[in-house]
UniProtKB/Swiss-Prot annotation:
Keywords assigned by UniProt, alphabetized: Cell inner membrane, Cell membrane, Membrane, Transmembrane, Transmembrane helix
Organism of provenance: Yersinia enterocolitica serotype O:8 / biotype 1B (strain NCTC 13174 / 8081)
Subcellular location(s) per record: Cell inner membrane
Protein name: UPF0283 membrane protein YE2117
NCBIfam families: hyp_HI0043 (TIGR01620)
Record flagged with keyword NAD: no
Pfam families: DUF697 (PF05128)
Protein family per UniProt: Belongs to the UPF0283 family.
A GO-annotated cellular component: plasma membrane
InterPro entries tied to this protein: DUF697, UPF0283
Superkingdom classification of source: Bacteria
Membrane topology category: Multi-pass membrane protein
Transmembrane domains' residue ranges: 71-91, 101-121, 214-234
Length: 354
């Protein structure tokens, strides 16, 4: 017995042809492009993206040059020239008329103006030094992907002089002994980053650990919130100054404000996700709520924020970018803070219980 025929199926729309992927046209590379080809580095791309975003925000925060601003600048310049010309005229008249009081007052005013100009020049020089450090990091990034020879050693020796390392420093001697004529710029800079730079980074880490511990203990034992905020602000500024001095940067008023702003912007860019990830990794497993008081928990939070501030200050003051796992992690400082609070707070509570 034959099977019954299936009924006919009518489709509302005609069948569409299968869409084939569109292939790109062939691209031929010349010999020069093949020799200068480098594989993509995800860490370097992330650093470049972070620097690009930071530059965009800094450009957005800078006031735009307008016609009124130019007119005000020209007016101030003309006023300064007029004041100088009038002062010279007063000095000449006072000398001819033997008016010693007017001559003394004019001389005192001139000394004050010279002191002000000197302060402005000094601040500009320190601010320029801070900007130059960012340019040195860009040069270091270029050398870390370069296969040339000759520029890496001179660059690293310049960094050593800026850091105040003499030729007799053990780390610098080990680096010089490890160099060979066949090393390219990338290998020379990597050796410097592994042998010389850690000597400065370890000092900065020790300062961050000490300041973070002091902030945590102060918050944990102090009953006054206003005193806590003033103390934390003062210690954080001291920490930034100390880290900058370790890396050979002398901060002035404006350069200190700029560095502090860059640090805060860097923290804002990273967001709270990194802080939550680092702090919350083993927060619940250690059951800190049962072991430490609420004030101690607040102290840990303040200490971690101080440590994060110090890490970002290190990143902005270092002449070299981070390589691999060299960047300090909040987890290292977290364990130190928890251990110090556990050892300190029970000692303070035992006499009260007795």
């Amino acid at each position: 017995m034959s099977e019954p025929l299936k009924p006919r199926i009518d489709f509302e729309q005609p069948l569409q042809p299968i869409d084939e992927p569109v292939l790109k046209a062939a691209q031929a590379f010349d010999q020069h492009a093949a020799e200068n080809f480098y594989p993509a580095d995800p860490e370097l791309d992330a650093e470049n993206e972070e620097g690009r975003v930071e530059g965009l925000v800094n450009a957005a925060l800078k006031p735009k040059r307008s016609l009124w601003r130019k007119m005000v600048t020209v007016g101030i310049a003309l006023f300064g020239v007029s004041v100088i010309a009038q002062s010279v005229q007063w000095v000449n008249q006072a000398w001819q008329q033997q008016d010693w009081i007017a001559l003394g007052a004019t001389t005192a005013g001139g000394l004050i103006v010279l002191a002000g100009v000197g302060s402005v020049v000094t601040e500009w020089r320190r601010l320029y030094r801070l900007r130059q450090r960012a340019e040195e990091r860009d040069i270091a990034r270029e050398l870390l992907v370069s296969h040339g020879i000759g520029q890496g050693r001179a660059f690293c020796e310049k960094l050593a002089r800026q850091a105040g390392l003499d030729q007799g420093h053990p780390a610098l001697q080990r680096w010089q002994a490890s160099l060979h004529e066949t090393h390219n710029d990338r290998e020379v800079v990597e050796l410097y980053a592994k042998l010389v730079q850690p000597s400065l980074d370890n000092l900065a880490r020790a300062e961050i650990s000490r300041y973070a511990a002091e902030s945590a203990l102060m918050i944990a034992v102090s009953p006054l919130a206003l005193v806590d905020m003033a103390f934390i602000a003062w210690r954080n500024i001291r920490l930034i100054n100390r880290i900058a001095a370790l890396y050979g940067i002398e901060l002035g008023y404006f350069s200190r404000i700029r560095l502090f702003r860059l640090v805060l912007l860097n923290i804002a860019f990273a967001g709270a996700s990194e802080l939550v990830r680092e702090v919350g990794m083993d927060w619940l497993s250690q059951d800190l709520a049962a072991r430490l008081s609420a004030r101690a928990a607040q102290g840990i939070g303040a200490g971690l924020l101080t440590a994060r501030l110090g890490i970002k200050a290190m990143e902005l003051c270092r002449p070299l970018p981070w390589l691999g796992d060299d960047k300090p992690k909040l987890g290292d400082f977290r364990r130190q803070l928890i251990g110090q609070l556990k050892n300190t707070l029970p000692k303070k509570d035992k006499p009260a219980q007795q």
